[in-house]
From Swiss-Prot:
Core component of nucleosome. Nucleosomes wrap and compact DNA into chromatin, limiting DNA accessibility to the cellular machineries which require DNA as a template. Histones thereby play a central role in transcription regulation, DNA repair, DNA replication and chromosomal stability. DNA accessibility is regulated via a complex set of post-translational modifications of histones, also called histone code, and nucleosome remodeling. Its main location: nucleus. The nucleosome is a histone octamer containing two molecules each of H2A, H2B, H3 and H4 assembled in one H3-H4 heterotetramer and two H2A-H2B heterodimers. The octamer wraps approximately 147 bp of DNA. It is found in: Nucleus; Chromosome. The keyword Cell wall biogenesis/degradation does not apply. It comes from the Eukaryota. The keyword DNA-binding applies. The gene is H3-5. This is Histone H3-5. Residues 1-29 are annotated as: Disordered. It comes from Stylonychia lemnae (Ciliate).
Amino acid sequence: NTGAKAPRKQLANKAARKSTNVNAVSGVKKPHRFRPGTVALREIRRFQKSTELLIRKLPFQRLVREIAQEYKSDLRFQSQAVLALQEAAEAYLVGLFEDTNLCAIHAKRVTIMP
């Protein structure tokens, strides 16, 4: 006996570990998935950097006309007036969600609910 240790059989283990990402039967690779919360944080950073409106313009315009219809029929809106309403509505909603998030954090929660 020369005192040398027998080589370990790790090659099979490594191959088995590597093949866990590939379906053994069909050979189809599983799609990459981010950990929960990673994409949400990335979206938060992206939207905080941007200044564009987040609600689509035409659906918002239809909503404004629908609400205005209840008060007076045949009202007309300048395009700038609808944009001003949308800016104000989005600013209000962003502030509301910020306050809601602070309340959730204060209550040691991560999910906000209606």
